[in-house]
């Protein structure tokens, strides 16, 4: 028996040595992802890390990194897209029940190709099963300059009947280090972006959501990985990862029997055994990741640059400052009061007036959140001249006009629900559970897609000067049943999201220059697929400036300031309007406040702050962000932005709740030109107040500012300073 075992082992090794091994490389300027085809035709990841300088070094990489632990004599590796029922015993990337009931799949390399895309190169690898006519195409889009890679997969087949997919990952990545640490972000309403770090040990950690819509309300679709130590801001090997999917998602982190970490980003398979017909293609969400040897800061700046250039709708264009009426009026307004607010917006100096919830429905007028959703015509008793009258009043005031919609939702007390109850996600045989007094429309249904598109299209067709939409989504999916899918409920969750994409694609194709804010009861939706259609998202309904510093700090690791809406409100009136405005000015600035409640000096301050923001916007929205002092690590917070040419910078410094007589350290800036001499000037000062900073008006070299820094913190709660350097 031993002799037979040795003969088989020798045959395996001979086969390995005799076969030429094809190597496929996905590269940025700083990162290499290298794959290799084994002699038997299977595809394995052989390297993911710092870019290798010498091409000859790729020949030294081996696919067979370890032997199986079950007595198998042939060596094994890390399969790029591991299947279910084969020789891998861990979480698969793809799992299929074939038309005949067989649950095994073996994928073999067929071909690979490269094609140029805007800003990079896309590699497409085709894998096929030899027994069943099943094909998987792996896509990798590499952006060399930004050091970002985007990965997704396509699954198709030509079997005689539908197959069932029960795993369908975007990609599968392997890492090797002594220790692994993951930071994921959990949340709730008004409590977004809460980081939690843990060490990954043998076994599996899963981060997922099952909310359907508003899917990021409890878990955010992004994470940090730290190798050998928890991820740090300015040092150490890290990876930032995020999935572009506003529905149920799942991150699987699994440390295997040889200590390798497998990272599997995917649509959550919860209640989603997907029936795929022959000839159809199942396309997974995009997984975007950036690696760095210099900590989170470098990786996030790369993500920001990539997002603005290649992913976010109108990512290289300006953003509008605005005044929103919601916290001022709630549902209680009319055409005359809105016209006055438009004049206030003009006097404030912002670009636009945004009308929020409460403007629609007639049979069941939108007086509160119990009625009206679905009936998208202006309430005649409130707005006798309708949207055309509002657009006219805004134009007369000298500002643009934007409007709020929640087109994916319906109130049972609405004409839409009375006419089309079959358009609603609702159990036919059980009591109905309402979330915020509303239900979700079944957008997997093409008729509902037409209806939702028609809401925006009708408003824009009748009112082409409408300049902006705030698209809200305040409910998760409850009463899970799709009248459209009937007996095929396993496809519903996924097709619902795809239905939303179809609607948004139609809107974007017809109105490509229409800015839209993505909102979901706060930050319940924030992902890079939706940002292909939206210019920005609402970070949180929590606008308390203290809490906003924590939220904005977390989200800025993954999203540029240009995409993060932040409004000055009356939340936490114990803080000054200056502190609230300075917090919001570090993102995409807006106001949602009763301006008449401000004192004369406060009003002059916000007017000047808008002018100052307009001057600083190129740095904040399009420059490089450096997070300097974390609110999570003490009682202060500081960030700075630097223009791309490094000629200008802005520093935001905030005192949260300093301890009595605590030591106050200088803030060392980052990203400056070490050889340039900068003049420091404090801005956003209250009328009649002079700066109390010793550095104000002085000149310093960039080298000094980065090595010695400036004394800009105080020991007073709710104090803030904004310094412009040029």
Sequence positions of predicted segments:
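Polysaccharide-binding surfaces and accessory modules of carbohydrate-active proteins
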Residues: 22-35, 42-254, 270, 677-694
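Glycine-rich, aromatic-flanked loop segments that form ligand/cofactor-binding clefts
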Residues: 75-77, 85-107, 230, 235-248, ...
């Amino acid at each position: 028996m031993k002799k037979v075992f040795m003969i088989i082992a020798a045959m395996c090794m001979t086969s390995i040595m005799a076969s030429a091994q094809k190597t496929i490389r996905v590269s940025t300027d700083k990162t290499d992802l290298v794959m290799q085809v084994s002699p038997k035709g299977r595809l394995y990841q052989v390297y993911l890390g710092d870019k290798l300088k010498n091409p000859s070094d790729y020949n030294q990489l081996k696919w067979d990194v370890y032997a199986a632990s079950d007595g198998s004599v042939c060596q094994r590796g890390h399969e790029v897209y591991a299947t279910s029922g084969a020789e891998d015993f861990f979480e698969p990337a793809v799992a299929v029940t074939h038309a005949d009931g067989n649950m095994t799949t073996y994928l073999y390399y067929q071909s690979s190709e490269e094609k140029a895309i805007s800003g990079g190169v896309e590699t497409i690898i085709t894998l096929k099963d030899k027994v069943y006519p099943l094909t998987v195409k792996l896509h990798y889009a590499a952006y060399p300059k930004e050091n970002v890679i985007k990965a997704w997969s396509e699954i198709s087949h030509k079997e005689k009947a539908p197959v069932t997919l029960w795993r369908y990952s975007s990609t599968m990545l392997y890492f090797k280090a002594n220790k692994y640490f993951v930071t994921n972000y959990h949340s709730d309403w008004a409590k977004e972006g809460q980081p939690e770090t843990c060490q990954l040990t043998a076994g599996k950690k899963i981060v997922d959501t099952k909310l359907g819509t508003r899917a990021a309300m409890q878990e955010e679709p992004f994470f940090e990985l730290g190798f050998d130590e928890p991820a740090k801001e300015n040092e150490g090997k890290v990876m930032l990862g995020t999935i572009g999917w506003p529905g149920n998602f799942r991150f699987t982190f699994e440390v295997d029997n040889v200590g390798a970490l497998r990272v599997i980003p995917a649509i959550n398979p919860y209640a989603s055994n997907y029936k795929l017909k022959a000839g159809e293609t199942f396309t997974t969400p995009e997984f975007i990741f950036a690696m760095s040897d210099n900590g989170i800061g470098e990786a996030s700046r790369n993500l920001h640059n990539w997002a603005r250039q290649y992913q976010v709708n109108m990512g290289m264009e300006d953003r509008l400052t605005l005044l929103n009426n919601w916290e001022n009026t709630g549902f209680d307004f009319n055409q005359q009061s809105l016209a006055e607010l438009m004049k206030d917006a003009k006097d404030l100096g912002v670009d636009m007036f945004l009308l929020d919830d409460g403007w629609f429905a007639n049979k069941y007028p939108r007086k509160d959140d119990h009625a009206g959703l679905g009936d998208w015509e202006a309430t005649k008793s409130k707005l006798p001249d309708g949207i055309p009258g509002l657009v006219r009043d805004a134009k007369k005031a000298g500002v643009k006009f934007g409007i709020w919609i929640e087109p994916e939702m319906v109130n049972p007390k609405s004409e839409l629900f009375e006419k089309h109850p079959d358009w609603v996600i609702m159990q036919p045989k059980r009591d109905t559970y309402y979330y915020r007094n509303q239900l979700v429309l079944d957008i997997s249904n093409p008729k509902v897609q037409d209806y939702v598109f028609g809401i925006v299209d009708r408003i824009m067709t009748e009112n082409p000067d409408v300049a902006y939409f705030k698209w809200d989504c305040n409910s998760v999916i409850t009463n899970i049943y799709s009248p459209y899918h009937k007996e095929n409920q396993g496809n519903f969750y996924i097709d619902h999201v795809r239905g939303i994409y179809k609607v948004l694609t139609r809107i974007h194709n017809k109105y490509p220059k229409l800015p839209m804010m993505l909102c979901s009861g706060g930050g319940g939706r924030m992902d890079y697929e939706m940002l292909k259609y939206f210019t920005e998202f609402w970070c949180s309904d929590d606008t308390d400036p203290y809490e906003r510093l924590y939220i904005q700090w977390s989200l800025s690791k993954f999203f540029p300031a240009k995409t993060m809406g932040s409004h000055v409100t009356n939340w936490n009136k114990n803080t000054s309007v200056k502190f609230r405005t300075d917090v919001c000015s570090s993102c995409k600035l807006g106001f949602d406040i009763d301006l008449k409640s401000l004192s004369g000096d406060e009003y002059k301050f916000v007017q000047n702050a808008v002018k100052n923001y307009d001057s600083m916007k190129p740095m904040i929205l399009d420059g490089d962000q450096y997070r300097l002092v974390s609110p999570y690590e003490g009682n202060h917070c500081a960030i700075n932005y630097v223009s791309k040419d490094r000629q200008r910078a802005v520093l935001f410094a905030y005192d949260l709740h300093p301890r009595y007589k605590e030591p106050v350290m200088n803030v060392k800036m980052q990203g400056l030109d070490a050889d340039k001499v900068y003049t420091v000037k404090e801005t956003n000062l209250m009328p009649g107040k002079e700066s109390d900073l010793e550095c104000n008006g002085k000149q310093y070299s960039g080298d000094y500012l980065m090595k010695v820094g400036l004394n800009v913190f105080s020991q007073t709660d709710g104090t803030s300073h904004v310094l412009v350097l040029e």
